Design a protein with these regions (language model features):
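A membrane-topology feature that recognizes alpha-helical transmembrane segments
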Residues: 1-306
Length: 306
């Protein structure tokens, strides 16, 4: 159990995180609107009225104002509250994970970039080059601190090559890239942070996260279009794969069952892919969600659980 001093430091790390989160909101919104992050002073995005000092207190202002502008009474985006709270929580988690160290400081910066890039990607599907460059730079600095620079450089190249390969696969189905160029830069940045070997697990976890988010939306779309054959093929593939995994966990299982199970998984998977690709005739038919947030979620999970 943490001692009193550790909890005291954690409290102030959380407060600092809230304040940084408030600043990150400014970076996000003014970056998208191409305004200076310094001038003009904070204002309501609806009525443009300059805010009073107590309107800028992280979390508290949103609660006290009940999520509305003090002047025009229009609703304030919950993004302000969510980003501030998330930053505070992540900063505190990083403190408990790394302690007071150079690695902690670098991770605070890296996670700040994660948050900014996630929100801009979700809001406008935009990844600014400067943020990608900073991610690579601080990833390399972190690798220097951990005496692992060569591994980091290989990770950058690996991340870029893998994402470009995946992006090219999109041309086979929807005549366009499967992922944006920004996602390639993100993968390069994650390669700088993790190195080449852990990056493979992070990218695999990213695909799982993306699938978990996208699958319900895709199934809903198929249901509305009455594409029941595709829904059934997806369900069969998932059921067969789950049963195969359960059976192969038994060490006494015969090789015949393993071979038959493997064939069933492959056949059901190919049939599932065939049905899905038949329903995706163009990029507009596909459910396209930004992949950057999935990579950042996967990276965060890997960092905190590793």
């Amino acid at each position: 159990m943490p001692d009193i001093l550790t909890l005291y430091i954690a409290f102030w790390i959380f407060i600092i995180g809230l304040c940084i989160g408030s600043f990150l909101n400014v970076v996000i919104l003014r970056g998208l609107s191409k305004e200076s992050i310094v001038f003009p002073p904070s204002k309501c995005p609806k009525c443009q009225h300059a805010l009073i000092w107590w309107h800028n207190i992280p979390l508290l202002s949103y609660i006290l104002l009940r999520g509305k502008c003090y002047f025009c009474h229009e609703k304030i985006s919950p993004q302000y509250f969510i980003v501030e709270l998330l930053t505070g929580i992540l900063f505190t988690g990083i403190f408990f994970k790394f302690g007071i160290s150079i690695s902690m400081l670098l991770m605070l910066i890296i996670f700040s970039l994660f948050i900014v890039m996630t929100v801009t990607d979700l809001k406008e599907k935009v990844i600014f080059d400067i943020h990608s460059i900073l991610l690579v730079i601080f990833g390399l600095v972190l690798s220097l601190v951990n005496h692992n620079l060569q591994n980091s450089i290989i990770g950058i190249l690996e991340g870029v090559l893998i994402m470009e390969l995946f992006a090219s696969i999109g041309y086979l189905f929807v005549k366009s890239r499967a992922f944006g160029v920004g996602d390639t830069f993100i993968a390069g940045g994650l390669g700088a942070i993790f190195g080449w070997y852990p990056l493979l697990f992070v990218l695999l976890l990213s695909l799982i996260v993306q699938a978990v988010i996208t699958l319900p939306l895709y199934l809903k779309k198929l249901y509305k279009a009455k594409e029941f054959k595709t829904i059934i093929s997806l369900a069969l593939f998932l059921i067969i794969t789950a049963c195969y995994k359960l059976f192969t966990m038994n060490k006494d299982i015969s090789m015949l069952i393993i071979y038959v199970g493997t064939i069933l998984v492959v056949v059901s998977g190919l049939y599932c892919v065939r049905q899905v690709t038949r329903n995706i005739k163009s990029a507009t038919d596909a459910i396209i969600l930004p992949f950057g947030p999935a990579m950042f979620i996967a990276a965060s999970i890997f960092i905190f659980l590793n």
